[in-house]
């Protein structure tokens, strides 16, 4: 029987980050569009830096805007408290009953990730947390997923990645892991969709799928 491990995007934080990026950029006299920011979803810091600097020109100070974005995002998160996507709690409970370990693998920094999980009251539900600041190469490179599998002590080919971004799917494929797509904000190509084990409408459809996979 195969052991399936969850790596997921479990909080409604993407919209917070977009708000924070746009607000921070305005303070520095720049306009960041939602469409441009969606292209950075799940990608490495280096990719995001190159994309935004190319789009906004030489006067754009990426690091200064990013640091202010972090401050704004933390403020929003603490004031509004992130909530889990519907189905996350049920999925975690199902995994615990089945004895399947779960991990978080996210491009977000470790401090922000731990804050998100703690405020959502699911921090203790994960056996491993791997963040973008812990690996040399971000998504779409496989490093973040490979490190998560290593920390769990499970072979990559026995892992199941649940993703909502194309760069995340590419990283999981490069790691040799099975993929499930639950689309969220950004577009995902038909090629990426077809490479997945399943494409679900919401996290609520995940527990039944996991149950079928383990039988």
List the predicted regions and their residue ranges:
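Conserved phosphoryl-transfer catalytic core
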Residues: 18-38
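Asp-based, Mg2+/Mn2+-dependent phosphohydrolase catalytic module
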Residues: 93-96, 109-215
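Conserved SAM-binding loop
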Residues: 10, 84, 102-105, 137, ...
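Asp-based phosphoryl-transfer active-site loop
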Residues: 1-15
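Metal-dependent phosphoesterase signature
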Residues: 52-90, 98
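Helix-loop "lid/cap" segments that line or gate small-molecule binding pockets
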Residues: 24-25, 44-59, 116, 148-149
């Amino acid at each position: 029987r195969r052991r399936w491990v969850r790596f997921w995007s479990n909080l409604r934080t993407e919209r917070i980050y977009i708000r924070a990026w746009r607000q921070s950029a305005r303070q520095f006299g720049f306009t960041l569009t939602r469409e441009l920011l969606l292209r950075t979803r799940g990608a490495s810091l280096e990719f995001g830096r190159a994309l935004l600097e190319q789009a906004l020109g030489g006067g754009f100070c990426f690091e200064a805007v990013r640091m202010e974005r972090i401050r704004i995002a933390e403020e929003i998160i603490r004031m509004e408290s992130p909530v889990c996507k519907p189905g996350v709690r049920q999925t975690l409970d199902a995994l615990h009953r089945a004895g399947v370990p779960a991990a978080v693998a996210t491009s977000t920094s470790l401090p922000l990730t731990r804050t998100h999980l703690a405020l959502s009251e699911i921090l203790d539900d994960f056996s491993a947390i791997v963040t973008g600041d812990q690996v040399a190469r971000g998504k779409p490179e496989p490093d973040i997923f490979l490190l998560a599998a290593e920390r769990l002590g499970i072979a990559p080919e026995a892992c199941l990645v649940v993703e909502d971004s194309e760069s995340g799917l590419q990283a999981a494929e490069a790691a040799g892991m099975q993929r499930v797509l639950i689309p969220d904000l950004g577009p995902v190509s038909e090629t990426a969709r077809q490479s997945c084990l399943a494409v679900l409408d919401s996290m609520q459809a995940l527990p039944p799928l996991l149950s079928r996979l383990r039988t």
